[in-house]
Amino acid sequence: MLKGENAAQEQLLAEVDRFARVNSMRAKMDLKFEDNSFAEFGVAEKYKTADGEVVVQRPGKILLKVQIPIIKTDVAQMTSDGEKFRVAILEDGGTGKYKKFVLGTNSADYTALQKEVDKIENGEAQALKQNVNAFANMRPQHFTEAMLLRPVDTAANVYVQSEIFQEEFDINAKQKSPLRWVLRGYYLLDEISKQADGTMKISRRFWFDRVGGIRLARQQIFDASGDVESDIVYGREGDLTENGDYKKLPLRIEVTRPKEKYKMSLTYQDPTGVSIGKTYPQAAFLLENLWNLPEVNLDEKLREMKTKQTQAEVEKSPTPNNK
């Protein structure tokens, strides 16, 4: 068992708020994408890694550009203004028929729509999954809370501290060492919020690595049902910006979205080149369809699907016999 440091809850809360000091950021990043929705098909090779440029700003605003490395061709661009999102799929690795401009609402649940896509059984299923799903399922807002942590709110929430030990692989141990598997201790800090009906719900869980100090290593965000919405892992720490004013912040962030079945890691290409604290105009977070791509409004698609389902149920329901 690795030796762990002790910390009171106040120190853990302060560490979350230290991360939350970042109000805006602009950075160039290396992106690595893993699409698990159709594991048997995999992902088009050139989309596994990409260059990215990201701009984030509170509250919940983000611009993300994804480019093919070396040739710097835009694969996708996406924005969210905190309420709505827009995704332009600019490259599909094929004929271009999967290029789209997708619009939707941050708070909406499009799981039902995704299930309809998953029912595809014709020859286009593989091409669709390889070339479109990787970016069509990405939502820019998935990355805002990973990069811009919300500060704690002790007036509105209850925070509960506990500890946990996990068996982990020690990459620093010698290859034949019997100590390659170690027990690492973590503090868990659960954020519990009171609902309108009086029930309590977990909204976030923070994991703090206790080995060699206290380090925020992971953030889990839960939905209204208590299921994991985002699982965010923070890598090794370093200093950001040219002057190094923002110290001991993660240089790599990994975001896993279980419902959308994908994982994205973001690594700063040049930590000293990161810009923090500037204010960006609202227009920067409102992507326009300058490419005249076919538009797909997910809210409209969802309404259409629900209407069809309702009509189908009515048609299937038995009618009383005429007397």
Question: PLM ranges: what are they?
Answer:
Residues 1, 136, 152-153, 157-300, ...:
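Gly/Pro-enriched, hydrophobic low-complexity segments
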Residues 1-48, 127-137, 305-323:
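N-terminal leader/targeting segments and the immediate start of mature chains
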Residues 31-85, 91-93, 287-289, 296, ...:
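Post-signal peptide N-terminal segment of secreted/secretory-pathway proteins
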Residues 43-49, 73-77, 95-102, 200-203, ...:
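Short, mixed charged/polar active-site loops
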Residues 16-25, 45-47, 54-60, 71, ...:
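Edge/loop elements at the starts and ends of beta-strands within beta-rich repeat scaffolds
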Residues 115-127, 167-180, 195-197, 300, ...:
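Intrinsically disordered, low-complexity segments enriched in small/polar residues
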Residues 57-142:
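An acidic-aromatic
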Residues 138-154:
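Solvent-exposed helix/loop surface patches that form functional interfaces
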